[in-house]
């Protein structure tokens, strides 16, 4: 969960004691709960308790300081994130107090830095393992672009462990959900990355034999 850059107020530190909410209609927890409930969002209490209400599928907003956050759906610690990015929000100061707010910011700062470091390290390792497996550059780009989405992040360690069978299986699973519109594009074999292929295929004729045994073993219904 990250704030939208254009909603960060650089002068907010000059208004430390201003607590008038920007969205008075969402001042109560019930009102914020309702904003999530009508859109069938699960486990929304943690967001409403952090002073946030539903704006759109890609965005939630603080009723007090007005800061907007994106990529929020899988966030486990919205209160900490809100405190970290909007430390002078009147709601956060009233809820946590100055000392509690400072402790939470320091705690999340360590977590945030570690998370960024681990993500970068995982990407580097994953790229190297895919390269060692002999996958083409377009294939590696496809995996790296999609594998770090929250629902799939848990599978990364299997790729890092050089599990070629799993990588093919995982890629086929991703392909079924992330099929790109290739009407005006030339697409290439996902193994060699050299030979052009038809828009509804994944491998060239030379690589089909190499890849068929993997898909046959995994009982996959992927068109070669």
UniProtKB/Swiss-Prot annotation:
Residue ranges that the Swiss-Prot or TrEMBL entry lists as coiled coil: none
Designated name of the protein: Inhibitor of apoptosis protein
Organism of provenance: African swine fever virus (isolate Tick/South Africa/Wildebeeslaagte M1/1996)
SUPFAM superfamilies: Inhibitor of apoptosis (IAP) repeat
Main location: host cell
Entry's family note: Belongs to the asfivirus IAP family.
BIR repeat spans: 29-92
Domain of life of the organism encoding this protein: Viruses
UniProt GO MF annotations: metal ion binding
Gene induction: Expressed in the late phase of the viral replicative cycle.
Gene: p27
Keywords assigned by UniProt, alphabetized: Activation of host NF-kappa-B by virus, Host cytoplasm, Host-virus interaction, Inhibition of host caspases by virus, Late protein, Metal-binding, Modulation of host cell apoptosis by virus, Virion, Zinc
Binding site for Zn(2+): 62, 65, 82, 89
Subcellular location: Host cytoplasm; Virion
């Amino acid at each position: 969960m990250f704030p939208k850059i254009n909603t960060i107020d650089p002068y907010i530190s000059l208004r430390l004691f201003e607590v008038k909410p920007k969205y008075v209609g969402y001042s109560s927890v019930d009102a914020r709960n309702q904003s999530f409930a009508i859109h069938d969002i699960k486990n929304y209490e943690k967001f409403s308790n952090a002073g946030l209400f539903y704006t759109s599928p890609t965005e939630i907003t603080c009723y007090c300081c007005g800061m907007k956050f994106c990529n929020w759906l899988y966030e486990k610690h919205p209160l900490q994130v809100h405190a970290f990015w909007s430390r002078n929000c009147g709601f956060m100061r009233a809820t946590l107090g100055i000392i509690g707010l400072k402790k939470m910011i320091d705690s999340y700062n360590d977590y945030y830095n570690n998370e960024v470091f681990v993500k970068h390290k995982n990407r580097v390792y994953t790229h190297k393992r895919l390269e060692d497996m002999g996958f083409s550059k377009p294939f590696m780009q496809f995996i790296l672009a999609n594998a770090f989405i929250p629902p799939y992040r848990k599978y990364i360690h299997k790729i890092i462990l050089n599990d070629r069978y799993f990588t093919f299986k995982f890629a086929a699973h991703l392909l079924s959900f992330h099929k790109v519109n290739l009407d005006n594009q030339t697409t290439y074999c996902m193994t060699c990355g050299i030979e052009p292929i038809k828009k509804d295929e994944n491998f060239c004729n030379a690589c089909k034999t190499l890849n068929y045994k993997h898909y046959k073993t995994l009982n996959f219904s992927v068109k070669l």
